[in-house]
């Protein structure tokens, strides 16, 4: 599991168009905000995605690109992007190996049951590829604003 201060791993993962993308393809002037979510088109994930969409111009003003990551297929991502007018890249980790390496896949407790699945997480990575901040087990609603506020407070 990665920690703050670690170098961000740089695998090639397919985007919504099926094109393999790496960190250098996605990073903006100051860095990247990668949010890991369970599933396209579910209520919480839609809330999270549309909040990032609505705040994207503010993230760009701070020099950050926003990218989503889930197990969903490129086809599912395309439908999700189209339905909700999402202007950012969604990556696919079908076998969850990258999410597991990040610590965003594993055992979780929900409604009193223990299961294995996506642990909703966000990673703020600077331009040099170093993880500046990790948010784990986040609530979808309001999370994008919290990340933006934290980045704004940290930017001189």
PLM-predicted stretches and their roles:
Residues 1-156:
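Chalcogenol-based redox active-site neighborhoods
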